[in-house]
UniProtKB/Swiss-Prot annotation:
Keywords recorded for this protein, A-Z: Carbohydrate metabolism, Chitin degradation, Cytoplasm, Hydrolase, Magnesium, Metal-binding, Polysaccharide degradation
Cofactor: Mg(2+)
Main EC class the enzyme belongs to: hydrolase
Main localization (coarse): cytoplasm
Assembly notes: Homodimer.
Gene Ontology cellular component list: cytoplasm
Keyword Heme: no
The organism of origin for this protein: Salmonella typhi
EC number, as in UniProt: 3.5.1.105
Protein name as catalogued: Chitooligosaccharide deacetylase
Keyword Mitochondrion: no
InterPro entries: COD_ChbG_bac, Glyco_hydro/deAcase_b/a-brl, YdjC-like
Residues that bind Mg(2+): H61, H125
Amino acid sequence: MERVLIVNADDFGLSKGQNYGIVEAYRNGVVTSTTALVNGEAIDHAAQLSRELPALGVGMHFVLTLGKPVSEMPGLTRDGLLGKWIWQMAEEDTLPLDEIAHELACQYQRFIDVFGREPTHLDSHHHVHMFPQIFPIVARFAAQRGIALRIDRQTVLNADDLPSDLRSTQGFSSEFYGEEITEACFLRILDASAHRGEASLEVMCHPAFVDNIIRQSAYCYPRLTELEVLTSASLKAGIAERVYRPGSFLDI
């Protein structure tokens, strides 16, 4: 059985080093798709690069934890900035859901304004769209617009509540991250997905060249390691041996 493999590079637009790393992993590696932070410092640079690569699927990386929001969000920001306190607010069930829904729509429109087209799909920075309070908002939004959504099915409390017309891959993995960034890890992800009988799989990654912005990230030099692995000839061969067809979210 032929299976669709989407290797999605998160954080397009975060920095020029991130952008160049993603483009390198697409041109000379196994990356097939990316998602962009519309409030990133290098988002215009990302859009410019994407126009030179029309086959690269570009989705939207919904941001609620970094930088300035596109709309006014007094209930979520501190000193006008987004941050990781969103986790505590989620635990306390004090998230400003109306503001979040409005910000999602505003970021979506900003994406269209910057890239000149709709995104191929939605996911989010730090997976905040998988919060139980936020997921229904994002799932409904994606279904209404007919675009796909990254779904980590291990964290969805009730898959029966998903909109019937919502598109996603059958499998998703965030395991290619952190301390174990190896070809062996990547190929194990594919083998496990095949064992589960999934016809489509998304593997998340963050390839980048290190620059001053990336140095400020808690996840810095592993991004460069990811780039090295994702552009290796042996990884390409291993994927081909497993009868996976490279694709984007337009293929599901």
